[in-house]
Amino acid sequence: MRTRYLIGNWKTNKNLKDAVSFVEQFQQNKLNYNAKIGIAPVYVHLTEIKKIISDSLLLFAQDANFIESGSYTGTVSFTQLQDIGVNNSIIGHSERRKYYNETSAVINQKLFACLKASMQVVLCIGEALGQEISFLKTDLTNCLDTIDKSLIKNLVIAYEPLWAIGTGKTATPEVANQTIKTIREYINDLYDENVANNISILYGGSVDHNNIQKLAIMEQIDGFLVGKASLEIKNFLEMARVYA
């Protein structure tokens, strides 16, 4: 059975007080979940949150540089994340691609470095409005170039159609399910059926407590990468209750 996830990507939101309060409130909830639940705060909050976070939550970075150290102003390396006990990272989010001009070649280097270091990585992929779904195969092929099958065990994929991120629009459950099924077929082409059947593929793009239940019943969807709706503890707990 594939591992299920609910991950909140906080982007550039929350001050430290609010971030700590969120974690404390979540951890006061003593429910047992069948899915792995995680949060991705900003870099500067990771150390403090690491001090208080329990095993009930996974702690993700929002990005990780493939350079171990050196003259690369403004970046944080995968080794520095591991040094503070953060072993999970989102890579290739569409906002990184859009605002920081990240190419699939750069994403590939980040993936290789993180996966080789046994970090868990959520690779984000998605097509723009008007792009053919086949774009996803090209993007996957480029991002996963040089990534050996032995490294894939720590990889999770998040399908986030660009037209749905932060817009309030979401793919219908049927469309999201079919697209993720197609992504599995692409993974099968790149690796094999076993990898395709066992890799967890999440959906992201305007997921909230109102629509998560209809998406969650889809066979191919193994969880969710949630943006804005993960910022409020009440909403996030409701999504966890409904899904996880």
Curated annotation (Swiss-Prot):
GO cellular component: cytosol
Active site: H93, E160
Enzyme class: isomerase
Annotated Gene3D superfamilies: Aldolase class I (3.20.20.70)
Pathway(s) of this molecule: Carbohydrate biosynthesis; gluconeogenesis; Carbohydrate degradation; glycolysis; D-glyceraldehyde 3-phosphate from glycerone phosphate: step 1/1
Subcellular location: Cytoplasm
Keyword check for Isomerase: yes
Positions contributing to substrate binding: N9, W10, K11, G166, S206
Any one GO molecular-function label of the UniProt entry: triose-phosphate isomerase activity
Catalytic reaction list: D-glyceraldehyde 3-phosphate = dihydroxyacetone phosphate
Keywords associated with the record: Cytoplasm, Gluconeogenesis, Glycolysis, Isomerase
One GO process term, biological-process aspect: glyceraldehyde-3-phosphate biosynthetic process
Family: Belongs to the triosephosphate isomerase family.
Protein purpose: Involved in the gluconeogenesis. Catalyzes stereospecifically the conversion of dihydroxyacetone phosphate (DHAP) to D-glyceraldehyde-3-phosphate (G3P).
Record's subunit section: Homodimer.
HAMAP family, per the entry: TIM_B
Full protein name: Triosephosphate isomerase
